[in-house]
Amino acid sequence: MSEPLLSTDRLVKRFGGLLATDNVSVDVRPGEIHALIGPNGAGKTTLVGQLTGNLAPDSGTIRFAGRDVTRLPTHARVRLGLGRSFQITSVLREFSALDNVALAIQAHDGHSFRFLGDVRKDRKLRDAAQRGLDAVGLGARANAIASALSHGEQRQLEIAMALAGEPRLLLLDEPMAGMGVEESQRLVAFLHGLKSRCGMLLIEHDMDAVFALADRITVLVYGRVLASGTRDEIRAHPDVRQAYLGEETT
């Protein structure tokens, strides 16, 4: 079995009297989609904040790419290969899809303050951005203004932007949110194909998507890991069925 690409060991985070993550241990292996599910308030967002470096754990450790990154800032984790998409789309709506990806590439390369006009003149950069759009199925929409894209296309664009840094691990925070059935199915198919490029930690409420995609699933309830295992193990777990999947057990 391969060494985990990302692992946490007994992460604890408190907000006053609220224990948001209670000794959470989870890992993601290379080429794996590991889904993190749980009801609202389960601690998923707090856990992701600790993984990205936006929140510091009170105790516990985080390892990524063979290093202890518990106290590393966000930008250092990005440099190591940690990418993220957000629960709410973060594209620049007034710019084209190609501009969005080009700006993401140059930001990752350390040129965040170049003017957009300079970016548009950089043929090498724009070719790379076009390849990024082609990879997520948006090549034909390169010149479309982001605000004119469908919600599903904006999600694909955001993933293209996250992939601009060639991450080893991608954190996907509710990528199906707000999508219709057909858009969700297309994104599921795309994420399946993405597994060969990077591992993924998927935070998602769409159970059809979760069980279609995940190699393993971890269930959080009240900040604790209730269960972790394969799709079949989670489906059959009596506590999960009762507490989260909404089924009565006998």
Summary of predicted features, one role per range:
Residues 2-250:
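Glycine-rich phosphate-binding loops of nucleotide-dependent enzymes
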